[in-house]
């Protein structure tokens, strides 16, 4: 059964169960969208009323509605969005894996160890660049402590999920190596980890990735890329709408846009269009 808010009693709004035929009638009568026949009924059922019609009835925000007159128009946008996700998903997975591997290589080279506690002590030291006791250093220390907590939370989570690579080391009563930790960190968790690395490791990663060095004076361009694609990656993985970049809930650092404009010679990269992410 499908549901739609149709009846209001007093101050409350109640869900009224609707059949697929009832929802098609609602779209015709209330929304003035031409929809009929078994083929379109099947398409609406496959899309899902909420994920399909409700999700694709606007651009960016619900107040910016699309004036559909025919169900075929909605299907065209839905199909475009689905194909876009199919195109981007393998690329996003490749980027995530590559970034983790580049960072892992430099961490192992710098520390000569795969032990998380040792790496945490020796390399996650970005906080030391701030004046001792200053607000900036306190915030950096809080972030560093939060990263440690997130790593152990991720290991607990994945052990509970019976992740083989995690269970293997715990059952052997040995510490989980950094490469295995990277396998279970989400992209956001990885971004927070990277943010705490010292300048030397960050600079080495930036050079290895071939970034435009004058645009990466603080060696944080990698972090900015991680967080720029994190929300898109999550939206694609969860099959959310992406064509209008509604997934973006945080502003993209302007220095990332500037760097991309220099390298690509494409102007006005704002990440307000999905094409900017493809660049």
Regions found by a protein language model. Name each.
Residues 1-231, 243-279:
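Extended intrinsically disordered or low-complexity regions, especially N/C-terminal cytosolic tails and loops
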Residues 239:
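Acidic/aromatic/glycine-rich contiguous surface patches that form carbohydrate-binding/processing clefts
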């Amino acid at each position: 059964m499908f549901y739609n808010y149709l009846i209001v009693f007093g101050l409350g709004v109640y869900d009224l169960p609707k059949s697929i035929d009832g929802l098609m009638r609602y779209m015709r009568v209330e929304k003035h969208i031409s929809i009929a026949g078994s083929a379109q009924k099947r398409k609406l059922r496959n899309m899902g009323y909420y994920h399909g019609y409700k999700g694709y009835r606007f651009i960016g925000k619900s107040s910016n509605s699309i004036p559909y007159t025919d169900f075929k128009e909605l299907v065209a946008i839905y199909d475009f969005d689905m194909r876009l996700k199919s195109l981007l998903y393998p690329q996003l997975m490749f980027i995530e894996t590559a970034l983790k591997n580049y960072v892992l290589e430099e961490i192992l080279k710098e520390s000569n160890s795969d032990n998380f506690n040792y790496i945490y002590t020796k390399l996650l030291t970005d906080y030391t660049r701030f004046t001792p006791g200053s607000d900036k250093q306190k915030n950096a220390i809080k972030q560093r402590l939060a990263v440690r907590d997130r790593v152990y939370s991720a290991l607990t989570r994945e052990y509970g999920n019976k992740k083989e690579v995690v269970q293997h080391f715990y059952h052997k009563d040995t510490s989980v190596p950094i490469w295995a930790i990277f396998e279970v960190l989400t992209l956001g968790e990885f971004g927070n980890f990277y943010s705490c690395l010292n300048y030397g490791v960050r600079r080495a990663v930036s050079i290895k990735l071939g970034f435009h060095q004058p645009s990466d004076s603080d060696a944080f361009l990698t972090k900015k890329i991680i967080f720029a694609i994190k929300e898109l990656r999550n939206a694609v993985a969860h099959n959310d709408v992406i064509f209008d970049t509604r997934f973006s809930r945080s502003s993209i650092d302007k220095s990332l846009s500037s760097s991309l404009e220099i390298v690509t010679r494409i102007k006005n990269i704002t990440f307000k269009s999905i094409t900017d992410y493809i660049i």
